[in-house]
Amino acid sequence: VNDYELMTAALVHGRGHDFDLAALREVIEKRGYVREAGTYKITSRDMLRCEYGIVVSARDGRGMELPLNPDFPPASALSPEQAVAVKKILNSRDFITLFRGSAGTGKSFTLREVTAGIQAAGLPVVVLAPQRQQVADLCADGLTADTLAHCLLIKSLPRRAVVLVDEAGQIGGKQMDMLINLVKAHNGRLILSGDTRQHGAVQASDGLRAIEKFSGLRAAVLRDIRRQNPALARSAKERAFVTGYRKAVKAASS
């Protein structure tokens, strides 16, 4: 977080109390926060250790596993780009595999095919998302899903489960660390689907962004907008995205 954001929140919360900005700065300095060079960003040492553990798990897990299902033939209904993404994920030899797709690229359709490929290899699949509405959307797309919070609460997974997390960019550092440790404890694998450019973590830290930035992993990516009719969008946000995309393409072509 930026130090000025922390100070703003403290001043609002402490309204009516006898302290000023100078006193607040002094307290922040005494807390021993770690500062990022050349920026206003600060973090706690505990959070830094958490992010470091996340990145190390992702980095050290590169190339350490067998491919999930390298011989699985993607469905003919997939676009060439979607088929490439499915093959890349199913051929992954990493403990953590990254998948990124913007709204309208057919991400859910692709994830459903990835799930089919993993299950065809005899591996259990656990699909998770941070919020209940996201879980409902995944279920509507034909996937059996649960909330991340419930999974972390019960602390139980099938052995060798492949855990697929949608909207992983919304997961905070502590939850990501807990999830990674849970998957490791059950000898599983982790697929993180999300776009840090669209959504950020609600809780402190951003686990997916740390992995993308420092682990050296390369994501399977969908870029082509498949749902180009705004009327077919599933939400107002997606409708606005598709409408804006079409306007941008039209402007670039004129």
Please report, for each region that a protein language model flagged, where it lies by residue.
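Conserved ATP-binding/catalytic motifs of P-loop helicase motor domains
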Residues: 1-254
